[in-house]
Design a protein with these regions (language model features):
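Polar low-complexity intrinsically disordered regions enriched in Ser/Thr and small residues
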Residues: 5-18, 27, 48, 71, ...
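Low-complexity, glycine/serine/proline-rich disordered segments
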Residues: 1-55, 170
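Intrinsically disordered, low-complexity regulatory segments
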Residues: 51, 59-62
Length: 170
């Protein structure tokens, strides 16, 4: 489940895609997903993860809640084309026992994002964020866009961030 190092979902040592305004699903990951009807529907593409939520809409009493629970650990995120950070626990709407990759946070046949990776929470507070997505493989330069969105969020919700918040470059 997630962004492994090898196979169609990992970089296998090749790293990220070249810097771009947006990133589509890496070709080998997309092809592997198209071969799995519980991940990718030929008519509709990726289904939307039922827990996907814009991060500011997940704030409850100065912490994040996803599907009614306070996250404690890594959660998937994407920065969509509208400068919104979408977060969600791994939840496949077709088959809950199957994996739920980053493209399911936005859904569709050809999803594009500005960045994607993992946000780590401790008791619902943001601790760190990275660009580790085996499906989109965003360039680390794209993290600046994420940082800008988080700075705005921090300005209006300073207690949402852990005192140990750090920026993990990858």
């Amino acid at each position: 489940m997630g962004s492994g190092s090898y196979g169609p979902y990992g970089s296998g040592g090749s790293g990220s895609q070249p810097y771009a305004d947006t990133y589509g699903v890496y070709p080998s990951a997309l092809q592997a997903d198209k071969n799995d009807k519980e991940i990718y529907d030929p008519q509709k593409g990726y289904p939307v993860n039922p827990t996907a939520k814009e991060i500011s809409h997940a704030i409850v009493n100065e912490h994040i809640e996803i599907a009614g629970k306070i996250p404690d650990g890594p959660i998937t995120y994407v920065l969509n084309e509208n400068n919104e950070i979408i977060i969600g626990k791994r939840s496949n709407p077709i088959n809950p026992s199957k994996r739920s990759p980053h493209p399911m946070l936005v859904g569709g046949k050809d999803p594009h994002v500005q960045c994607a990776g993992m946000i780590t929470f401790k008791k619902g507070k943001i601790v760190s964020i990275d660009n580790q997505s085996g499906h989109f493989r965003p360039n680390k330069k794209s993290m600046e866009k994420v940082y800008q969105v988080l700075k705005k969020l921090q300005g209006s919700n300073p207690k949402l961030f852990s005192n140990s918040f750090n920026w993990r470059e990858t």
